[in-house]
A protein has these predicted regions:
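Short glycine-biased active-site loop of nucleotidyltransferases that positions the nucleotide triphosphate
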Residues: 50-53, 88, 136
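A cross-kingdom feature marking solvent-exposed beta-strand/loop segments within repeated
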Residues: 42-47, 80-85, 121-129, 133
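Vicinal oxygen chelate
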Residues: 1-7, 16, 73, 100-155
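Exposed loop/turn and edge beta-strand positions of beta-sandwich/beta-sheet ligand-binding modules
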Residues: 10, 56, 94, 128-131
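Core segments of cupin and vicinal oxygen chelate
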Residues: 17-69, 128
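Eukaryotic phosphotyrosine signaling hubs
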Residues: 91-97
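Non-DNA-binding regulatory cores of transcription-related proteins
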Residues: 85, 90-91
């Protein structure tokens, strides 16, 4: 059940600033299997809204076309770029990871064939219905991405 202020909907999307759209699309679209649902360049008052240095941004929404209201990953690039964030590392306060239900081994094989994702870390975690395959990889900009075996985590 959602609280009144959320209008009955779960989280719509998480936005990631990317350095290279081609490489990021190879990771999220070709590697993880997300569909491109929108690819558009917007001119707006982004300096006021986001404290950006540019009024132009490219936005690509990726996800499942059957679920337009939730679970979307937005790749964003501002004209002129943005400053790089802190280097990836151990968990810290703030943004931690993106997590996806996927066929873990198939997804790792696709990422490996595409030469994206870095060196995966894979475990079998004991769950209520038995072992659940889990792995983490890094997207092209260093974001930690968790892969959890689809259909096994909540049984």
């Amino acid at each position: 059940m959602y609280r009144r202020g959320l209008m009955g909907r779960p989280l719509h999307h998480a936005a990631l600033c990317v350095r290279d759209f081609a490489v990021s699309l190879r990771f999220y679209r070709d590697g993880l299997g997300l569909d491109v649902m929108m690819d558009h360049t917007f001119d707006g008052d982004w300096p006021t809204l986001f404290e950006a240095r540019s009024g132009t941004l490219r936005s690509v929404f990726l996800g499942d076309p059957a679920m337009l209201d939730a679970g979307v990953v937005e790749l964003v690039a501002f004209a002129g770029g943005v400053e790089s964030g802190p280097p990836p590392g151990a968990p810290a306060t703030g943004f931690f990871l993106l997590s996806f239900f996927v066929a873990v081994d198939d997804t790792l094989a696709r990422l490996r064939a595409l030469d994206v994702g870095g060196t995966p870390r894979r475990i079998e975690q004991r769950g209520p219905a038995g072992p659940v395959a889990m792995a983490t990889v890094r997207d092209p900009d260093g974001v930690l991405v968790e892969l959890i075996e689809a259909g096994r985590a909540h049984r």
